[in-house]
Structures are given as structure tokens and as C-alpha cells.
């Protein structure tokens, strides 16, 4: 498992529209570089580029933490029994607060106004873009892995390094989203903190905790390929990785659609999934699609607008 805080962050440009659903991933549903999106606030699906969806303005921006925020995050980190895991998670806090510490030290130094202004611009770039760049570093490692998965090839999982890259990637894809932020926001916590300030760091902490647990299970886990043998396409959404056992469960069977005719389940459940390749029909595809829809925050995506429109009319409660 890698702590992506070691990766350099290019600061030549500021990315305003920051994606919590990977654009490269969504391209599998595109035709002529566009896919269909059904938003909760729009009655009709619309055809658009992946760059225009699954994103919010400065979604990953780091802010200066208050004493209460730090106390809350340290309490969260302290739950881990592993000293190494606590160290990794402390690294996320340190990385997120690095620019504010630099700014504090600069305030006590006599610097020419024009140089101070340039330094301030650089620090603001770091605060606004470092989070997305860290996620981008994880995704970069996953590009060849995703390509293999879409070929129904999981041989990479037998190699420790690429197995851990996959686990790290899917853990971050699970926790990095607006939906997971909103779920955590709804949970009451006795420690006073501002979720707007803590969440961009919490997402890394939760993902690191999950990845550590999954790495520990090693070869007990398998990648199950679900082949869509029906005319009903797999969809995806703005929460593209879901836990089939429930969002509030500690145990996870992670479902991840890869394209309209292929999805995977990452599981340790040999009894429920005895085969690594399973052909499924329309009813099962509908069930998985409804789960993606039910866990979506505000958007679902696919290559069939009529199907998305019909699906979005259903209640989000479990129908299967």
C-alpha cells in the first residue's frame, strides 16, 4: 500500500472543476467522446463529456484546521491499532497543513512585498490543488490495471506491488466522492469540528484504513468478473464503487462497473462467488444498476439515455 503524499504536485495551473469520479474511467461509456448523464435535478438525460460531470468547484481544497478539527482527526487516527497506519494517516494531516505552516513561518520573515505576493500565490495553488493531485497520482498507477480488468485479466493481482496498487486505488475511489462526504457529514460526532475543513483529509484517512485492511487479507480476496449477457447495460454513477454489504458495514464486497457489459466484485466470499467469471442476465444486471442508482449522490451515467430515465424514476429503496 502506497501513501500517495510522496508524489509531487504540479502547480503550473489551478484546476477549478475537481473530479471525484475519474474521467478516464468514465470514457468506457462514451460514444464520440460523450456519455449520457441523468441528474436528479434534471428530468431529461443529457449528452456530455466526462470532464463536465462528477465534479465540484475546488472539491479537494485543503483549509487551515482549527484546534477542534485537529483534535477530531487525531481521535480518528488513534483508532488504528497499527503504529504504521497511524503514522501514514498523520502524514495526510501534515501534508494538508504544510502550506499553512510555511505561511506562518514566512510571516515572521522580512520579505519584499512582490516576493511575498508570489509566495502567497504558490501557497494558495498548493491548498487548492494538492488534494486532487494526490488522487491523480493514485489513478495514474491504476491506468494499466483498469485496462487489464476490462480485458477480464486479473493476473496482476498475483503480484504484490500491483495488487496493492489496485487495492489502494479502489479504496480511494470508494471514499473520495461527494456521496461519502455527505454520509459522513450526517453522522453526529461529540468532538466539535468543521466537516468542510476535515473531510478532504478524512477521505484519505478512511481510504488508507480500508486499503490497509484489504492488503492484510491478501490472497483471501479475489476479483470476480460479472459478464453482462443481457441487453440491459451496466451503468455507473457519481459513487462508482459501492459496498454490496451496505455503506455502514465494516466488511466489504466492493462492486465496480467497468463498462456496459462488464463489472467486478472484489470479495473474500468464496461461498457466494465460487467462480472468477460469472455470466449474469437482465434481472441481476438490473439489481446491480439499482444499487448504483440508490447509492448515487445526484448523477448516474451510461450509454442508454432511455434506460437512465426509467431507472431514475424508481425509488432508491432496495427493490431486489
Which residues does each predicted region cover?
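Alpha-helical structural context detector biased toward long hydrophobic helices
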Residues: 2-17, 21-320
Amino acid at each position: 500500500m502506497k501513501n500517495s503524499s510522496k508524489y509531487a504536485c504540479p502547480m503550473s495551473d489551478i484546476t477549478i472543476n475537481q473530479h471525484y469520479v475519474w474521467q478516464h474511467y468514465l470514457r468506457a461509456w462514451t460514444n464520440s467522446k460523450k456519455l449520457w448523464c441523468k441528474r436528479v435535478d434534471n428530468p431529461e438525460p443529457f449528452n456530455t463529456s466526462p470532464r463536465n460531470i462528477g465534479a465540484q468547484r475546488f472539491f479537494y481544497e485543503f483549509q487551515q484546521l482549527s484546534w477542534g478539527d485537529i483534535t477530531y482527526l487525531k481521535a480518528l487516527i488513534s483508532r488504528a491499532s497499527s503504529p504504521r497506519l497511524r503514522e501514514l494517516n498523520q502524514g495526510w494531516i501534515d501534508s494538508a497543513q504544510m502550506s499553512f505552516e510555511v505561511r506562518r513561518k514566512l510571516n515572521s520573515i522580512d520579505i519584499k512585498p512582490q516576493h511575498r505576493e508570489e509566495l502567497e500565490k504558490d501557497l494558495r495553488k498548493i491548498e487548492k490543488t494538492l488534494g486532487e493531485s494526490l488522487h491523480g497520482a493514485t489513478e495514474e498507477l491504476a491506468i494499466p490495471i483498469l485496462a487489464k480488468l476490462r480485458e477480464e485479466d486479473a493476473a496482476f493481482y498475483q503480484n504484490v506491488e500491483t495488487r496493492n496498487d489496485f487495492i489502494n486505488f479502489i479504496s480511494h475511489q470508494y471514499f473520495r466522492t461527494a456521496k461519502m462526504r455527505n454520509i459522513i457529514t450526517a453522522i453526529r460526532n461529540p468532538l466539535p469540528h468543521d466537516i468542510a475543513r476535515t473531510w478532504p483529509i478524512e477521505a484519505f484517512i478512511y481510504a488508507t484504513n480500508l486499503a490497509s485492511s484489504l492488503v492484510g487479507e491478501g490472497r483471501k480476496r479475489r476479483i470476480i468478473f460479472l459478464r453482462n449477457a443481457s441487453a440491459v447495460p451496466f451503468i455507473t454513477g457519481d459513487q462508482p464503487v459501492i459496498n454490496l454489504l451496505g455503506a455502514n458495514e465494516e466488511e466489504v464486497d466492493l462492486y465496480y462497473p467497468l463498462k456496459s457489459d462488464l463489472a467486478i466484485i472484489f470479495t473474500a466470499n468464496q461461498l457466494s462467488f465460487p467462480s472468477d467469471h460469472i455470466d449474469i442476465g437482465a434481472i441481476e444486471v438490473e439489481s446491480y444498476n439499482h444499487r448504483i442508482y440508490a447509492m448515487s449522490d445526484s448523477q448516474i451515467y451510461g450509454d442508454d439515455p432511455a434506460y437512465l430515465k426509467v431507472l431514475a424514476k424508481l425509488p432508491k429503496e432496495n427493490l431486489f
